[in-house]
Amino acid sequence: MKKIEAIIKPFKLDDVKDALHDVGVSGITVTEVKGFGRQKGHTELYRGAEYVIDFLPKVKVEVVVEDSLAENVIEAIENAARTGRIGDGKIFVLNVEQAIRIRTGDRGADAI
């Protein structure tokens, strides 16, 4: 199994959610996060004072899928989240040794 984590722009969440549904993903976890990469922060002016915005708002989408579905999921996220501008985000792929559904005790692929 693979855990796929994608850090994306918040306004792309609905597109990514729809794309994941289209490739057969049945559940996702979404977290509002802040961070920066090459995009860095920016400066804003408010009531005559200058403020540095170090961390930019992003959304982290997490999904665990069987190995056979991983490439389709990665491609779906990539295509749905891409704007072509700096700050589109990152995708991380991790191995998952075990998944357990707490309610039923199902393990492995049956738990996801």
What is each stretch, according to the model?
Residues 1-112:
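Positively charged, small/polar-rich N-terminal and surface patches that mediate targeting and assembly
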